[in-house]
Structures are given as structure tokens and as C-alpha cells.
Design a protein with these regions (language model features):
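Short amphipathic alpha-helix with an adjacent loop that forms part of the alpha/beta core around
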Residues: 139-150
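Glycine-rich beta-strand-centered segment in the early N-terminal region that forms part
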Residues: 1-36
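Short, surface-exposed secondary-structure boundary micro-motifs
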Residues: 15-17, 33-34, 47, 92, ...
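N-terminal Rossmann-like NAD(P) cofactor-binding module of classical short-chain dehydrogenase/reductase
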Residues: 29, 88, 154-157, 179
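Glycine-rich phosphate-binding loop and adjacent beta-alpha segment
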Residues: 107, 115-118, 163-220
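Mid-domain Rossmann-like dinucleotide-binding core that forms the NAD(H)/NADP(H) cofactor-binding site
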Residues: 64-138
Length: 220
């Protein structure tokens, strides 16, 4: 048996000895271990808590922490997107994708997003995605090359994995980054270093949130 759940929001009811950064009554949220967020009340380390701003509801905070922090480290730290760049984001209508599309749009980037249905295409567009591709029906490599006039994109964010990872390499411009952060279709296949050289001195990384937020300073 094990506790379940790692993302929640709530109100501090009691503080342990030596806690100075929080007070009883503070609204807080977290998306980290130890597991157990499905409980009604629990003891939790304050170094993993974040105060909730007054204009954000508990429900929104609980739902957005993991996805929002994931979007942040992907587009601001793993590969820092700049205004004017065009990026490819797989699963653009997913939880992380919708947040990332809004953020990337605000940064001045152009987003190409793959989606699984026409309904998801409309949702992605409503959240800032300029170009959508039905990746199960269309050749996303050809479409990305067409949109970028054959140049490719500097970064691909891929949470799909097996079905898209190798093809994503063909969407990159020289020195481009493939950021694999999920595996909804299965694990991405092994990639030979020589293939990266042949396709333009490319980079591949497989980041996780917990390495990016493993200290209090990084979290806040």
C-alpha cells in the first residue's frame, strides 16, 4: 500500500517548530513528494509549499501546479525561447501544452502544435497556437518544413515519445534541441549519437521537473 496523489492546494492549520515563512491560515499549493495529496489533512514539508495569490482559487492552484511548473522549466530553462522564434509543441491541447501555448504567445514566439482531433485543434488555437497539425493524419515533418520555409525549428517539445521522437529530429534546424518530457505513446526509442551529427549537430534531452525544482530557491 502507498499514499496516492502529489498535487494539491489547501490552508495551513498548524505549524511545526521553527517555521517562519508561513503562518496559520495561509493558502498554499504543492506538486511534489511525499505522496498523499488525496488525504483530507496531512503533515507536509514547508520547503515544498508555494503561497497562492489572492486572485487564484484553490481549485485552479491545485490543478495548475504540476502542469504550470512543467511549462515554466521547459520554455524558460531547458530551452529558453525568445521572441520571434518558431517552436513545435506536441500535444498542444494537453494540460501542459495549453499553458505553454499561452506563455509562448506572450513571449512573442510562433507555435506549431500537433493535436489528435479537430476539436483539440480549435482548443489549441484559442490558447495561442498559430498552426495546428493533426499528427495522426498529416505528415507533421513536411508541414513544419513548409511553415518554416525549409529551415526547421530550433526546439521541439515532445511529451508523446515513441510515435513522434525520431520524426521530431527531422523538424529541427541545425543545432536544434529535442526536449522529450513525456511518453504518452510509449518510451521514445534509443537515439544514436551519430544520427544527431548527421541531422545537424542536434541535441536531445530528457528533463524532469524534480531536477529543476530540487531546491527552495529554484522552486520560488
Amino acid at each position: 500500500p502507498t499514499p496516492i496523489g502529489m498535487e494539491a492546494a489547501g490552508v495551513i492549520e498548524e505549524l511545526g517548530a521553527g517555521v517562519t515563512d508561513f503562518k496559520v491560515g495561509d493558502r498554499v499549493a504543492y506538486a511534489s513528494r511525499p505522496l498523499g495529496s488525496y488525504s483530507e489533512a496531512r503533515v507536509f514539508p514547508t520547503e515544498n509549499l508555494v503561497k497562492i495569490p489572492d486572485d487564484i482559487s484553490d481549485e485552479t492552484a491545485a490543478a495548475i501546479m504540476l502542469k504550470g511548473m512543467t511549462a515554466e522549466y521547459l520554455i524558460r530553462r531547458t530551452y529558453k525561447v525568445s521572441a520571434g522564434q518558431t517552436v513545435l509543441f506536441h500535444a498542444a491541447a494537453g494540460g501542459v501544452g495549453l499553458i505553454a501555448c499561452q506563455w509562448l504567445k506572450a513571449l512573442g514566439a510562433t507555435i506549431i502544435g500537433t493535436v489528435g482531433s479537430n476539436e483539440k485543434a480549435e482548443l489549441a488555437k484559442a490558447n495561442g497556437c498559430e498552426h495546428t497539425i493533426l499528427y495522426k493524419e498529416e505528415n507533421f515533418v513536411d508541414i513544419v518544413k513548409d511553415i518554416t520555409n525549409g529551415v526547421g525549428v530550433p526546439v521541439v517539445y515532445d511529451s508523446v515519445g515513441k510515435d513522434t521522437a525520431l520524426l521530431s529530429l527531422d523538424c529541427l534546424s541545425p543545432l536544434g534541441f529535442l526536449v522529450i518530457f513525456g511518453n504518452s505513446s510509449g518510451n521514445a526509442p534509443p537515439i544514436e549519437p551519430g544520427l544527431l551529427a548527421a541531422k545537424g549537430s542536434l541535441y536531445v534531452t530528457r528533463p524532469t521537473l524534480f531536477n529543476y525544482n530540487d531546491t527552495r530557491e529554484k522552486l520560488i
